[in-house]
A protein has these predicted regions:
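Kelch-like beta-propeller repeat domains
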Residues: 1-87
Length: 87
């Protein structure tokens, strides 16, 4: 991983691992993808809202981040990442 983080979540999609959000000293919006075939990490599109401790699930080819905490308040929002569109 390129960024140290805790309280993040991980989901698998198309054979890659996606590490989503979390905290360093602040809540994070960054998302990193690990490809075990090439043993390489890449940054992909960031979350709109920084969050850690979120629920995460892969459904119908997209990764959904649900709730979590942004460092100031608990969140009741949902974001979806589409790897084909990288957003």
């Amino acid at each position: 991983m390129g960024q140290q983080r805790a309280g993040n979540r991980v989901s698998e999609l198309h054979g890659c691992l996606y590490v989503v959000g979390g905290f360093d000293d602040n809540s994070l919006s960054s998302v990193e993808r690990y490809d075990p075939q090439s043993n390489k990490w890449d940054h992909v599109a960031a979350l709109t809202t920084p969050r850690g401790g979120e629920g995460i699930e892969t459904v119908m080819g997209k990764i959904f981040a649900v709730g979590g905490h942004n460092g100031n308040a608990y969140l009741n929002t949902v974001e979806a990442f589409d790897p084909v569109l990288n957003r």
